[in-house]
Structures are given as structure tokens and as C-alpha cells.
Amino acid sequence: MASKPDFDPNDPLDYSANLDYLNELVRAEPELYGIYKKDENGNELKDANGNRILDEEGDYSGYFRDIQWKNKAITELYYPGSVFKVITSAMGVDSGLANINTTFTCAGAYGVAKETYHCAGHKAHGTITLAEALRQSCNIYYIQLGQRVGSQTFYNYFDAFGITSRTGVDLPSETGFMQYYKANQLGEVQLASSAFGQAMAITPLQMCTAVAAAVNGGYLVTPHVVDKITDTNGNVVEEIGTNIRRQVISESTSDVIRQMMEYEVGNGTGGGKNAYVSGYRIGGKSGTSEQLNMHRRADGDYKKVASFVAVLPANDPEILVYVMLDDPNNARTDYSSILAAPVAGNIISEVAPYLGIATDGEDRSGTIVTVPNLVGTEWSNAQVQLNIQ
């Protein structure tokens, strides 16, 4: 091995992965991760009633490595949608052009050049602050914020957050073909659409590293899968460590973003309430965007991507969870706060205790909790209700 000239194949090294327990977790609760039985051609099997069959005994040793031999988190592009509003918020606050109480008015429709933009459901939010705009995911607010920030400043921050280059993760085949507008290409419409995440095609991991920088004090960090390498005696041969690429925003701006994201989840009362897990301070943001290929559904609307990003503890984040549902098959709603947020909450409920993430410090011992009657409730909805207790 040219890159490891001292490597002895007769004395193999071991590694400590940051996500080394996923196989155990998936096998324990396959329904949480949507693991279903498939035939030899990869088609999901169904029972006599047409329902998919959970695979509770499968071998998942390679599940996260070689599904189609493609890691979509770094090889495929998508429109981030409203999750990107976290970054636009950071741009406005850090540049001094906005603060948490800055107001704009949303009348439900907003014209830019020859285009007319709307919020979800054509809802008019009225005059609202930045904190409320993030919580209510107001497109029109963010268009106006983007206009105030301006094309050059917008692009400068966009680049600083690492979205114009590869993340540098230690995994193969990370794409470098992101699609975005440079400063001199950000016309009125391009800037308006970019401000709420519907004009740039990036990888999910790029969105994760950008959000991480927004909440960790402002530092863009290179992500790694391997934490350290040890020999057969347990001695650390190589420790990867933390590689800080640069500081993007100030500590004070990052503190504001953390507060706003926690307000979004709101202890089970905010716009991201379905990601809340009792005992933890969680920050989050939902996002619903159109698929990159712009394919249409049977109802004529574009196919969607529902996503949710969560960080915890919100006051001093240690982990980030990012859930993406590509063209979720749900006839009732496209809202990621309903579709993706509960998945994030379920993951947090399993991962946080395993990793020893600190709770909010409130002593709940001896507390009597009334469990709601969930008979007949869909599994995902029942899980959300139990997470809140």
C-alpha cells in the first residue's frame, strides 16, 4: 500500500468508526429504518395483503456501504429547500444586515421580475421576525432577506460555507459537480430562489457540513468516518482528529442560529415539533423541495424531497441528524415536518442515549406520565407521541 508503507498485512490494524453500531441498531428495529425483504432482483416482497415484509433476520454488514455501490450522501445532488434557510439566516445575521428581530412582511405572494413566489399553501404570514420566519418557513421573508444581503455577499458566504467544493470526507467518489450560481450569475430571480434553497444542486453531506458550521461556533470542519486506527494490542497508530478548514461566521452569530433552530422544535410545540424527544434540547429545520430531475407525479405536481436536519444538544451540539425522503409515497401531505421530522426524532431517541448525549438536566425520576391511547394509530405517529412524553 503506497499510502501506508509501514502496513504489515500479517499484523492487521483495527479501526474505530464513528458509526460502528448501525448494524446492531438496524437489526434490532428494522421498521425504524424501512428495511424490508427483497427477492434476488432487489424487488421488495409483499405478503398476501400487499404489505411489505420487514426483514428482521437479514445480514446488514454491508447495508450502509454497498446499496447499489453508491453513497448518495456524497454522489448525488438535490435541492436542499428550506433547510438552506438556516444558512441564509446566518448570512443575514453575520453580515450585520439582519438580526433575530428583523421584520419583513409576507402577503402570501411576492413578485420578482416576471416570477411570482408563494409560501406553502399560499399562506400569508404577515409581518414577522427572522425567528418566526424560520419557524414558519416563510419563503417570501427569505426572498426579501436575500435581496437585502445582495448577490455578492450571498455568494461569498455560500462559498465560505463550503458548498462550492467537496467536503473532503474520507470516502470514495464524492462528486465535485455541484450546480450553483456565482455572484455575477445571481440575477433577481436566481437570488430569490437561492435564498430559500431551490436554486442550487448540492450533496446532502455538503448541507450537513454547512449546518454544522452554522451551529458549532462557526467553523467549517472536514467530516470523517474513521475516528482512529489501532494495532492488535489496542495502541493508537493513527488518530484522525478534527480538521477545521476555516471560521465562516462569528461565535455570536452561531449562538443566534442555535437559538432559532431550538425555537423551531420548541419542546414539542414548534414547527419541527415532530422531531422532539423528551429530555433533550433539540434544534431543527424542515425542508421540502422539488426533485432535481423535475419529474411529475400522477396529480401533476412535481415529485418532492422531504428533509429535516436536527442538532443536539441545541445549546452545544454534539451530533447532527439529517433525514432525506426522496419522493415519499404519502398521498396526504408533502410537508417534511410531518414526514421527515418524526424519523429524525426516532433516530435521536435511539442514538442520543447510546452516545451518552447529555439531557436537559431536568430530574424526571418519580414523574408519573399518562401514556396516550394509541390503539389504531399509525406506527410513525405513535412513535412521535411517545417521544414527547
Q: What do these predicted regions represent?
A:
Residues G279, V323-I338, G345-Q389:
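Ligand-recognition elements built from short beta-strands and adjacent flexible loops
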